[in-house]
A protein has these predicted regions:
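Ligand-binding loop in jelly-roll beta-barrel domains
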Residues: 68-80, 85-86, 171-173, 182-203
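Short alpha-helix capping/helix-loop boundary micro-motifs
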Residues: 46-50
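Transition-metal
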Residues: 1-18, 94-113, 137-139
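C-terminal, non-catalytic macromolecule-binding modules
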Residues: 73-127
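Glycine- and acidic-residue-biased ligand/ion/polar-headgroup-sensing regions
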Residues: 17-31, 36-43, 73-76, 144-170, ...
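Conserved short histidine dyad/triad with adjacent acidic residue
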Residues: 121-127, 136-152, 171
Length: 203
C-alpha cells in the first residue's frame, strides 16, 4: 500500500524530466519501468531511498566493509570479497531474504562514501587501498608494445579489462583471466594499449 504510491510518484517525476540518476526516484522507476505491479512489490525498493547513490568513475573504486548494505545498479564492476558463506540479501531479488539475520548484521550508521583513486606503485601500476588482510587489488595500464614484469607473492589473478596482452607466450584479450601461482615471476607484453586488474592476497 505504501510502495505503489511511491512508485507512481517516481514515474510521474521521470515522465516530467525533473529527476536524474542522482535521485532515488529515477532508480525506483527504472526497476519497474515496464509497469507497476498490483501486488508483491519488492520491498527492497525502500533501500533506494535510504542508501547513498554513488557514481564511481571508470577505473576508480570504493571499499565497503562488512555490514554495509549495497547494490550495483548500472555498469560493469570488479568485486572482491573475503571468503564467506553468509552473504545476506536485502531486496531487489527473487531469492530468499532472511530479514532477521539481515537486521542483525547490517551496520545502520550513516556513512560518507569515499572514492578510491588508487596509490601509485610504479608508472604502470596503482594499488587500491583495502583495509583488510583478505585481499588487494591493483590496476596495470600498459602502452602498446610495453613489457611489464610482476612477481607474485600469493596466488594471484589477472583480469584483462581492455586490450590484448601476451602473458608467458599465451594471448589474452578483454574478459580473459590468468591465474598466477605464488612466488612466480611473470612478463606481460601489451599487444595493444591494455588495462588489467590484479587480485592478490597482501603480505
Amino acid at each position: 500500500a505504501i510502495l505503489k504510491p511511491l512508485l507512481e510518484e517516481a514515474a510521474k517525476a521521470v515522465a516530467k524530466g525533473t529527476v536524474t540518476k542522482n535521485d532515488p526516484h529515477w532508480w525506483a522507476h527504472k526497476y519497474y519501468a515496464d509497469g507497476i505491479p498490483t501486488k508483491n512489490i519488492d520491498k527492497g525498493i525502500f533501500s533506494i531511498y535510504i542508501l547513498n547513490i554513488v557514481n564511481i568513475p571508470k577505473y576508480k573504486g570504493i571499499f565497503q566493509g562488512a555490514g554495509i548494505l549495497h547494490a550495483y545498479l548500472e555498469g560493469q564492476n570488479i568485486e572482491l570479497m573475503a571468503n564467506s558463506d553468509n552473504v545476506l540479501r536485502g531486496g531487489l531479488t527473487p531469492k530468499h531474504i532472511d530479514v532477521k539475520e539481515l537486521i542483525h548484521h547490517v551496520n545502520f550508521v550513516p556513512t560518507n562514501p569515499s572514492i578510491l583513486k588508487g596509490d601509485k606503485l610504479t608508472d604502470q601500476e596503482i594499488n587500491y587501498p583495502c583495509p583488510v588482510p583478505d585481499f588487494g587489488l591493483t590496476k596495470i595500464a600498459l602502452n602498446q608494445g610495453e613489457v611489464y614484469t610482476i612477481s607474485s607473492y600469493s596466488l594471484e589473478m589477472l583480469l584483462v579489462m581492455d586490450g590484448e596482452v601476451i602473458i608467458e607466450d599465451m594471448a589474452y584479450k578483454a574478459g580473459d583471466t590468468a591465474l598466477l601461482t605464488a612466488n612466480a615471476k611473470v612478463k606481460i607484453k601489451a599487444h595493444t594499449a591494455t588495462v588489467l586488474f590484479k587480485a592478490y592476497v597482501p603480505k
